[in-house]
Amino acid sequence: SSLKVMVPKSTLPSYPSTEGAVIGAAVEMMKLLFPGDQEFIQQKAEEHRRASIISGANVRSDVEAGEALGRSVAQKFVARARTDRAGQAGGNPAQWSSMEDTAITKGETPWYSLELPKRPPMLPLFGKVKPFLFDSATVVALRPGPPPSVHSEQMKKETVEIYEMIANPTRERTGIVHFWADGVGTSTPSGHWDDIAAKDFLTKNYSEIRWARNFALLNMALNDAAIVCWDTKFYYFNPRPTQLNARIKTLTGIPNFPAYISGHSTFSGAAAAIL
Protein backbone atom coordinates (compact mmCIF):
# COMPACT_ATOMS: atom_id res chain seq x y z
CA SER A 1 0.00 0.00 0.00
CA SER A 2 1.11 3.55 -0.71
CA LEU A 3 -0.53 4.82 2.49
CA LYS A 4 1.91 5.60 5.28
CA VAL A 5 0.36 5.93 8.73
CA MET A 6 1.62 8.59 11.14
CA VAL A 7 1.14 6.43 14.25
CA PRO A 8 2.40 2.93 15.11
CA LYS A 9 0.61 0.27 13.09
CA SER A 10 -1.95 -1.73 15.04
CA THR A 11 -2.22 -5.51 14.79
CA LEU A 12 -5.99 -5.24 15.34
CA PRO A 13 -8.70 -4.93 12.68
CA SER A 14 -9.62 -1.30 12.06
CA TYR A 15 -13.42 -1.71 12.38
CA PRO A 16 -14.75 -0.57 14.75
CA SER A 17 -12.12 1.93 15.77
CA THR A 18 -10.79 1.61 19.32
CA GLU A 19 -10.20 5.36 19.25
CA GLY A 20 -13.82 5.89 18.29
CA ALA A 21 -15.04 3.68 21.14
CA VAL A 22 -12.95 5.71 23.58
CA ILE A 23 -14.35 8.96 22.18
CA GLY A 24 -17.95 7.77 22.40
CA ALA A 25 -17.65 6.46 25.95
CA ALA A 26 -15.58 9.37 27.25
CA VAL A 27 -17.85 12.07 25.82
CA GLU A 28 -21.00 10.56 27.34
CA MET A 29 -19.41 10.22 30.77
CA MET A 30 -17.77 13.66 30.68
CA LYS A 31 -21.08 15.26 29.70
CA LEU A 32 -22.60 13.77 32.86
CA LEU A 33 -19.71 14.73 35.13
CA PHE A 34 -19.03 18.20 33.71
CA PRO A 35 -22.33 19.59 32.40
CA GLY A 36 -20.93 23.11 32.22
CA ASP A 37 -18.11 22.14 29.85
CA GLN A 38 -20.07 20.74 26.92
CA GLU A 39 -18.38 22.91 24.29
CA PHE A 40 -14.88 22.00 25.49
CA ILE A 41 -15.75 18.29 25.61
CA GLN A 42 -17.07 18.34 22.05
CA GLN A 43 -14.01 20.27 20.89
CA LYS A 44 -11.66 17.64 22.31
CA ALA A 45 -13.79 14.84 20.87
CA GLU A 46 -13.53 16.39 17.40
CA GLU A 47 -9.76 16.73 17.76
CA HIS A 48 -9.46 13.07 18.75
CA ARG A 49 -11.80 12.06 15.91
CA ARG A 50 -9.79 13.95 13.29
CA ALA A 51 -6.50 12.62 14.65
CA SER A 52 -7.66 9.05 14.07
CA ILE A 53 -8.45 9.83 10.44
CA ILE A 54 -5.63 12.16 9.41
CA SER A 55 -3.04 9.85 10.99
CA GLY A 56 -4.07 7.17 8.52
CA ALA A 57 -5.06 4.72 11.27
CA ASN A 58 -8.80 4.59 10.49
CA VAL A 59 -11.33 5.58 7.87
CA ARG A 60 -14.29 7.67 8.96
CA SER A 61 -16.74 4.74 9.14
CA ASP A 62 -14.37 2.92 11.53
CA VAL A 63 -14.41 5.88 13.90
CA GLU A 64 -18.16 6.43 13.63
CA ALA A 65 -18.90 2.78 14.42
CA GLY A 66 -16.55 2.89 17.40
CA GLU A 67 -18.15 6.06 18.70
CA ALA A 68 -21.63 4.57 18.47
CA LEU A 69 -20.48 1.51 20.38
CA GLY A 70 -18.73 3.52 23.10
CA ARG A 71 -21.68 5.86 23.44
CA SER A 72 -24.19 3.02 23.86
CA VAL A 73 -22.08 1.40 26.59
CA ALA A 74 -21.54 4.70 28.42
CA GLN A 75 -25.26 5.43 28.37
CA LYS A 76 -25.81 2.34 30.52
CA PHE A 77 -23.38 3.73 33.07
CA VAL A 78 -25.08 7.13 32.91
CA ALA A 79 -28.47 5.53 33.55
CA ARG A 80 -27.02 3.66 36.52
CA ALA A 81 -25.37 6.79 37.91
CA ARG A 82 -28.69 8.65 37.87
CA THR A 83 -30.24 6.03 40.17
CA ASP A 84 -27.33 5.05 42.45
CA ARG A 85 -28.45 7.37 45.30
CA ALA A 86 -25.29 9.51 45.20
CA GLY A 87 -27.49 12.55 44.65
CA GLN A 88 -28.98 12.08 48.13
CA ALA A 89 -25.64 11.51 49.89
CA GLY A 90 -25.65 14.94 51.53
CA GLY A 91 -28.56 14.08 53.81
CA ASN A 92 -30.28 16.75 55.90
CA PRO A 93 -29.91 18.32 59.37
CA ALA A 94 -32.45 15.96 60.95
CA GLN A 95 -30.45 12.94 59.77
CA TRP A 96 -27.16 14.42 60.97
CA SER A 97 -28.71 15.15 64.36
CA SER A 98 -29.99 11.59 64.62
CA MET A 99 -26.47 10.23 64.09
CA GLU A 100 -25.15 12.49 66.83
CA ASP A 101 -27.94 11.46 69.22
CA THR A 102 -27.21 7.77 68.60
CA ALA A 103 -23.56 8.23 69.58
CA ILE A 104 -24.56 10.10 72.74
CA THR A 105 -27.07 7.38 73.64
CA LYS A 106 -24.21 4.86 73.48
CA GLY A 107 -22.29 6.95 76.00
CA GLU A 108 -19.72 8.12 73.45
CA THR A 109 -18.51 11.57 72.46
CA PRO A 110 -20.01 12.34 69.05
CA TRP A 111 -18.09 13.83 66.16
CA TYR A 112 -18.74 17.46 65.31
CA SER A 113 -17.42 19.74 62.59
CA LEU A 114 -14.23 21.52 63.60
CA GLU A 115 -14.43 23.97 60.71
CA LEU A 116 -14.99 27.67 61.36
CA PRO A 117 -17.65 28.45 60.49
CA LYS A 118 -19.05 24.96 60.84
CA ARG A 119 -20.13 23.28 57.62
CA PRO A 120 -22.41 20.32 56.98
CA PRO A 121 -20.57 16.98 57.14
CA MET A 122 -19.14 15.65 53.90
CA LEU A 123 -21.64 13.28 52.24
CA PRO A 124 -22.88 11.55 55.43
CA LEU A 125 -25.20 9.25 53.46
CA PHE A 126 -22.61 8.14 50.90
CA GLY A 127 -22.72 4.76 52.62
CA LYS A 128 -26.20 4.34 51.10
CA VAL A 129 -24.92 4.69 47.52
CA LYS A 130 -25.29 1.58 45.36
CA PRO A 131 -21.94 -0.22 45.04
CA PHE A 132 -20.67 -1.62 41.75
CA LEU A 133 -19.75 -5.09 42.95
CA PHE A 134 -22.13 -6.04 45.77
CA ASP A 135 -25.44 -5.09 47.34
CA SER A 136 -26.31 -2.85 50.28
CA ALA A 137 -26.64 -5.83 52.63
CA THR A 138 -22.99 -6.62 51.93
CA VAL A 139 -22.05 -3.04 52.84
CA VAL A 140 -23.48 -3.65 56.32
CA ALA A 141 -21.83 -7.08 56.52
CA LEU A 142 -18.43 -5.55 55.69
CA ARG A 143 -18.79 -2.79 58.29
CA PRO A 144 -15.95 -3.13 60.85
CA GLY A 145 -16.68 -3.47 64.54
CA PRO A 146 -16.73 -0.38 66.76
CA PRO A 147 -13.66 1.72 67.57
CA PRO A 148 -12.23 1.76 71.08
CA SER A 149 -14.47 3.74 73.41
CA VAL A 150 -13.39 7.34 73.90
CA HIS A 151 -13.30 6.50 77.62
CA SER A 152 -11.02 3.46 77.21
CA GLU A 153 -7.35 3.17 78.10
CA GLN A 154 -6.61 2.14 74.52
CA MET A 155 -8.02 5.36 73.12
CA LYS A 156 -6.12 7.38 75.72
CA LYS A 157 -2.87 5.67 74.67
CA GLU A 158 -3.56 6.19 70.98
CA THR A 159 -4.35 9.86 71.54
CA VAL A 160 -1.11 10.30 73.49
CA GLU A 161 0.76 8.62 70.62
CA ILE A 162 -0.60 11.20 68.18
CA TYR A 163 0.20 14.11 70.49
CA GLU A 164 3.81 12.99 70.96
CA MET A 165 4.32 12.73 67.19
CA ILE A 166 2.73 16.13 66.55
CA ALA A 167 4.73 17.74 69.34
CA ASN A 168 7.99 16.44 67.84
CA PRO A 169 7.67 16.77 64.06
CA THR A 170 10.66 15.69 62.00
CA ARG A 171 11.43 16.58 58.40
CA GLU A 172 10.68 13.00 57.39
CA ARG A 173 7.29 12.94 59.15
CA THR A 174 6.32 16.32 57.75
CA GLY A 175 7.26 15.19 54.25
CA ILE A 176 5.15 12.06 54.56
CA VAL A 177 2.19 14.07 55.84
CA HIS A 178 2.31 16.54 52.96
CA PHE A 179 2.80 13.83 50.33
CA TRP A 180 -0.34 12.02 51.48
CA ALA A 181 -2.41 15.02 52.64
CA ASP A 182 -4.52 15.03 49.44
CA GLY A 183 -6.81 17.80 50.66
CA VAL A 184 -9.15 20.20 48.91
CA GLY A 185 -7.91 21.26 45.48
CA THR A 186 -5.84 18.10 44.93
CA SER A 187 -6.62 14.78 43.29
CA THR A 188 -7.62 13.52 46.80
CA PRO A 189 -6.57 10.07 48.10
CA SER A 190 -8.40 8.09 45.42
CA GLY A 191 -6.99 10.24 42.61
CA HIS A 192 -3.54 10.04 44.18
CA TRP A 193 -3.65 6.27 43.71
CA ASP A 194 -4.80 6.74 40.11
CA ASP A 195 -1.69 8.85 39.58
CA ILE A 196 0.55 6.21 41.16
CA ALA A 197 -1.05 3.55 38.96
CA ALA A 198 -0.73 5.64 35.79
CA LYS A 199 2.99 6.19 36.34
CA ASP A 200 3.47 2.45 36.80
CA PHE A 201 1.35 1.55 33.76
CA LEU A 202 3.46 3.86 31.59
CA THR A 203 6.60 1.89 32.43
CA LYS A 204 4.91 -1.34 31.31
CA ASN A 205 3.77 -0.10 27.88
CA TYR A 206 0.21 -1.34 28.41
CA SER A 207 -2.28 -1.27 25.56
CA GLU A 208 -5.37 0.92 25.75
CA ILE A 209 -7.35 -2.22 26.62
CA ARG A 210 -5.15 -2.97 29.63
CA TRP A 211 -5.25 0.67 30.71
CA ALA A 212 -9.04 0.75 30.57
CA ARG A 213 -9.44 -2.57 32.36
CA ASN A 214 -6.91 -1.80 35.08
CA PHE A 215 -8.39 1.62 35.80
CA ALA A 216 -11.88 0.13 35.86
CA LEU A 217 -10.82 -2.48 38.42
CA LEU A 218 -8.92 0.05 40.51
CA ASN A 219 -11.67 2.67 40.56
CA MET A 220 -14.55 0.28 41.14
CA ALA A 221 -12.64 -1.01 44.16
CA LEU A 222 -11.98 2.55 45.37
CA ASN A 223 -15.63 3.49 44.91
CA ASP A 224 -17.03 0.49 46.76
CA ALA A 225 -14.43 0.79 49.52
CA ALA A 226 -15.46 4.44 49.95
CA ILE A 227 -19.10 3.39 50.32
CA VAL A 228 -18.29 0.91 53.11
CA CYS A 229 -15.93 3.42 54.73
CA TRP A 230 -18.55 6.19 54.79
CA ASP A 231 -21.20 3.79 56.05
CA THR A 232 -18.86 2.96 58.94
CA LYS A 233 -17.88 6.56 59.67
CA PHE A 234 -21.42 7.81 60.05
CA TYR A 235 -22.68 4.68 61.78
CA TYR A 236 -20.26 5.14 64.69
CA PHE A 237 -19.92 8.96 64.41
CA ASN A 238 -16.55 8.78 66.15
CA PRO A 239 -14.78 12.05 67.16
CA ARG A 240 -11.50 13.31 65.77
CA PRO A 241 -8.42 13.12 68.06
CA THR A 242 -8.39 16.92 68.34
CA GLN A 243 -11.79 16.74 70.01
CA LEU A 244 -10.36 14.43 72.67
CA ASN A 245 -7.17 16.42 73.24
CA ALA A 246 -7.18 20.13 72.42
CA ARG A 247 -3.36 20.18 72.52
CA ILE A 248 -3.23 18.16 69.29
CA LYS A 249 -2.52 20.55 66.42
CA THR A 250 -2.62 18.76 63.10
CA LEU A 251 -0.03 19.35 60.37
CA THR A 252 -2.82 19.55 57.78
CA GLY A 253 -6.48 20.49 57.78
CA ILE A 254 -8.93 18.37 59.74
CA PRO A 255 -11.35 16.42 57.49
CA ASN A 256 -15.00 17.35 57.87
CA PHE A 257 -16.27 13.89 58.76
CA PRO A 258 -15.86 11.35 61.59
CA ALA A 259 -12.48 9.75 62.28
CA TYR A 260 -13.31 6.04 62.32
CA ILE A 261 -12.52 4.37 60.01
CA SER A 262 -9.74 6.25 58.23
CA GLY A 263 -10.65 7.21 54.68
CA HIS A 264 -7.00 7.45 53.61
CA SER A 265 -6.30 3.96 54.93
CA THR A 266 -9.40 2.56 53.26
CA PHE A 267 -8.48 3.98 49.86
CA SER A 268 -4.88 2.85 50.24
CA GLY A 269 -5.85 -0.67 51.28
CA ALA A 270 -8.19 -1.10 48.32
CA ALA A 271 -5.74 0.38 45.80
CA ALA A 272 -2.75 -1.57 47.07
CA ALA A 273 -4.69 -4.85 46.90
CA ILE A 274 -5.72 -4.23 43.27
CA LEU A 275 -2.33 -2.97 42.12
Residue ranges and their predicted role:
Residues S1-L275:
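Acidic/polar surface patches and capping/hinge elements
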